[in-house]
Swiss-Prot record:
<comment type="pathway">
    <text>Cofactor biosynthesis; (R)-pantothenate biosynthesis; (R)-pantoate from 3-methyl-2-oxobutanoate: step 1/2.</text>
</comment>
<dbReference type="GO" id="GO:0015940">
    <property type="term" value="P:pantothenate biosynthetic process"/>
</dbReference>
<dbReference type="InterPro" id="IPR040442">
    <property type="entry name" value="Pyrv_kinase-like_dom_sf"/>
</dbReference>
<feature type="region of interest" description="Disordered">
    <location>
        <begin position="1"/>
        <end position="36"/>
    </location>
</feature>
<feature type="active site" description="Proton acceptor">
    <location>
        <position position="215"/>
    </location>
</feature>
<feature type="binding site">
    <location>
        <position position="78"/>
    </location>
    <ligand>
        <name>Mg(2+)</name>
    </ligand>
</feature>
<feature type="binding site">
    <location>
        <position position="117"/>
    </location>
    <ligand>
        <name>Mg(2+)</name>
    </ligand>
</feature>
<keyword id="KW-0479">Metal-binding</keyword>
<protein>
    <recommendedName>
        <fullName>3-methyl-2-oxobutanoate hydroxymethyltransferase</fullName>
        <ecNumber>2.1.2.11</ecNumber>
    </recommendedName>
</protein>
<dbReference type="InterPro" id="IPR015813">
    <property type="entry name" value="Pyrv/PenolPyrv_kinase-like_dom"/>
</dbReference>
<keyword id="KW-0808">Transferase</keyword>
<dbReference type="Pfam" id="PF02548">
    <property type="entry name" value="Pantoate_transf"/>
</dbReference>
<dbReference type="InterPro" id="IPR003700">
    <property type="entry name" value="Pantoate_hydroxy_MeTrfase"/>
</dbReference>
<comment type="similarity">
    <text>Belongs to the PanB family.</text>
</comment>
<feature type="compositionally biased region" description="Low complexity">
    <location>
        <begin position="22"/>
        <end position="33"/>
    </location>
</feature>
<keyword id="KW-0460">Magnesium</keyword>
<comment type="subunit">
    <text>Homodecamer; pentamer of dimers.</text>
</comment>
């Protein structure tokens, strides 16, 4: 009887059901109790043809909002280098700078799968370094999985981590940590380079990665790779055929300054609203309007 109950609940909980399509209402907590999203749920969604969204996040409060919104996968990306710490690239950020961010996100998102980025310099030297870095994120921060950049060149690291029981999300195409080698922010996998991108995708899948991010890859190539792989693909500037999509949340919500990349769609003007609220608050304080009687004891 208990097995039947468990099986039935698995079919109806948040983690086992596909994400709710845009424009439709999420099931109520009473009708569909939520549980933790696991890597096997992403595999199930790929097999069933259900697409899903991933967002970056770097703090407790934002993680809580996205978890409440039903975002199934949250990435504490090394993009924190840019949007949290103000570095020009992702290269300078360290494990010690990322771990406190991951801790906050894990606490704020009880249902999402939380993935932590391994920063530049923490895994390139080989499997032992990768295992040491990933272990810190799992033990000290409570991450559920880690992400690392590279294809064939990091296959041994991926195999080592998965053998140790650490789920790995791979990242191919444009890899921001290699921006200096790649000559800037350039689309990868065009022309003859397509074969290497395909080889990278196959290599990370065979090494044991549970999914792979493809960044700034031609849509046609991303479609081909998604069809070849049994693991989910996650696109960022890789067209609509990927199994999932990811954006930096500040780009998605309109908090980032400057021109957005071509692959970004802005769904809000959070930056404008924050500025408006801050200006109004300052004016109310200066004019003696705030605090008013209702704000006093």
């Amino acid at each position: 009887m208990s097995e039947q109950i468990s099986e039935q609940s698995e079919q109806n909980v948040y983690g086992a059901c596909p994400p709710v399509p845009a424009g439709e209402s999420s099931p109520s907590a009473a009708s569909a109790p939520r549980t933790k999203v696991r890597t096997h749920h992403l595999q199930k969604w790929k097999a069933e043809g259900h697409k899903w969204a991933m967002l970056t996040v770097y703090d407790y409060s934002t993680a809580r909002a996205f978890d409440d919104a039903g975002i199934p996968v949250l990435l504490v990306g090394d993009s924190a280098a840019n949007v949290v710490y103000g570095y020009d690239t992702t290269v300078p950020i360290s494990i010690d700078e990322l771990i406190p961010l991951v801790r906050g996100v894990v606490r704020g998102a009880p249902h999402a799968l939380v993935v932590a980025d391994l920063p530049f310099g923490s895994y390139e030297s080989g499997p032992s370094a990768a295992l040491a870095a990933a272990t810190r994120f799992m033990k000290e921060a409570g991450a559920h999985a880690v992400k690392l950049e590279g294809g064939e060149r990091v296959a041994e690291q991926i195999a080592c981590l998965t053998a140790a029981g650490i789920p790995v999300m791979a990242h191919i195409g444009f890899t921001p940590q290699s921006v200096n080698t790649l000559g800037g922010f350039r689309v990868q996998g065009r022309g003859d380079a397509a074969e290497q991108t395909i080889a990278d995708a196959i290599a990370v899948a065979e090494a044991g990665a549970f999914s792979v991010v493809m960044e700034m890859v031609p849509a046609e190539l991303a479609t081909q790779i998604t069809g070849k792989l049994t693991i989910p693909t996650i696109g960022i500037g890789a067209g609509p055929s990927c199994d999932g999509q990811v954006l930096v949340w500040q780009d998605m919500a309109g908090l980032s300054s400057g021109k957005a990349p071509r692959f970004v769609k802005r769904y809000a003007d959070v930056g404008g609203e924050l500025r408006r609220a801050a200006v109004q608050y300052a004016q109310d304080v200066a004019g003696g309007v705030f605090p008013a009687e209702e704000h006093c004891f």
